[in-house]
């Protein structure tokens, strides 16, 4: 047992720590490998920024200002974690249409995101041609994707094979929903990746619904990760609403691929908080009670609590971050809406190559 003096000193130290916490957050525990306090706070900011971009997209759609929106609410932790597990400027991302958080965490700006939604002429992804969230930013290592479900998985595996053949230390991250795993091209890509031992990480963001089809009606096994064994590489499951847990799993898979040890299938168990897209109504296949229960799995307050428990953030800092993110989204919206749309003169741009033939 401690002496009265030791107990008093411990009490005073605790009180002092409480005062420090109220004035400025202090790190009280060791942090995950590769993540500093500043990086963790930045990851939280990216999650909040994505949520506000998502909310704005659906509001603009309901106002008739943009034609379509796809939500990533409930996926933010898995996507941001995956982005930070990669080596920025070296590793490639082959995303799918629900990857707003991944894009915003890997170099896409809110202005660029909103330009895409408004389909403006100077939209950097496709000059207003593609569906929203069909990213293509080669200079930031974000590959163009296809609207055909799971087609991009085969493309990504081909990229990974090319990097291996060139002996480049590059890892390719390919993301998709569990609905994609019912497509033939997904299985072709997995089989090819296993045979050729390519440096790829497959990230399945399993939100349990392929539009309106629940997982139990599209899979005979409980987990997507269970399928990896048939292709000769590991399958790992993680809680996709836990950003730190997901980071650890994806980071390990990335480093494994970089060392030449082959593919990994990571299944992040997430949830979809809203309808599939702005053209869907989830109340036709989900009960209001089911939808309300999902709020308890929200990754943003969960990560905020984790950061607060470790002295990395406090309520004031959280409020300031949300205010900053909201201002950034407001600016992006006003700026993007004011940009000119494509005209007939732009019809054949990006169709034919320009410049000398030689």
Predicted feature locations:
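Glycine-rich ThDP/TPP pyrophosphate-binding loop and its adjacent helix/strand module
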Residues: 141-338
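Conserved acidic/glycine
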Residues: 1-78, 84-85, 268, 274, ...
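Cofactor-binding active-site loop characterized by glycine-rich and histidine/acidic residues
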Residues: 52-55, 59-196, 214-220, 225, ...
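A generic structural signal for short, non-catalytic loop/turn and secondary-structure boundary residues
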Residues: 40-42, 86-87, 128, 259-261
């Amino acid at each position: 047992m401690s002496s009265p003096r030791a107990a008093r000193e411990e009490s005073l130290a605790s009180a002092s720590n409480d005062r420090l916490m109220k004035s400025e957050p202090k790190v009280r525990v060791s942090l995950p490998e590769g993540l500093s306090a500043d990086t963790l706070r930045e990851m939280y900011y990216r999650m909040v920024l994505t949520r506000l971009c998502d909310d704005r997209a659906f509001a603009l759609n309901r106002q008739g200002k943009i034609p379509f929106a796809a939500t990533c609410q409930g996926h933010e932790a898995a996507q941001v974690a995956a982005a930070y597990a990669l080596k920025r400027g070296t590793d490639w991302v082959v995303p799918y249409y629900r990857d707003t958080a991944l894009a915003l965490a890997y170099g896409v700006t809110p202005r660029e995101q909103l330009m895409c939604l408004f389909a403006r002429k100077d939209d950097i992804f496709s000059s207003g041609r593609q569906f929203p969230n069909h990213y293509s930013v080669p200079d930031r290592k974000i590959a163009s994707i296809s609207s055909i479900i799971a087609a991009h998985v085969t493309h990504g595996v081909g990229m990974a094979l090319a990097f291996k053949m060139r002996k480049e230390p590059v890892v390719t991250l390919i993301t998709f929903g569990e609905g994609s795993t019912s497509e033939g091209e997904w299985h072709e890509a997995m089989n090819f990746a296993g045979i050729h031992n390519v440096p790829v990480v497959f990230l399945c963001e399993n939100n349990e619904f392929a539009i309106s089809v629940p997982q139990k009606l599209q899979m005979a096994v409980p987990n997507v990760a269970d399928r990896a064994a048939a292709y000769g590489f590991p399958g790992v499951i993680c809680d996709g609403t836990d950003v730190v847990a997901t980071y650890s799993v994806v980071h390990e898979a990335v480093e494994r691929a970089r060392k030449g040890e082959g593919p990994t299938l990571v299944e992040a168990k997430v949830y979809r908080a809203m309808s599939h897209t702005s053209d869907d109504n989830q109340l036709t296949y989900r009960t209001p009670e089911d939808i309300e229960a999902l709020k308890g799995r929200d990754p943003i307050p969960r990560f905020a609590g984790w950061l607060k428990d470790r002295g990395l953030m406090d309520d004031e800092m959280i409020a300031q971050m949300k205010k900053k993110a909201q201002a950034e989204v407001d600016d992006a919206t006003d700026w993007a809406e004011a940009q000119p749309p494509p005209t007939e003169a732009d019809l054949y741009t990006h169709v034919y190559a320009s410049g000398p033939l030689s």
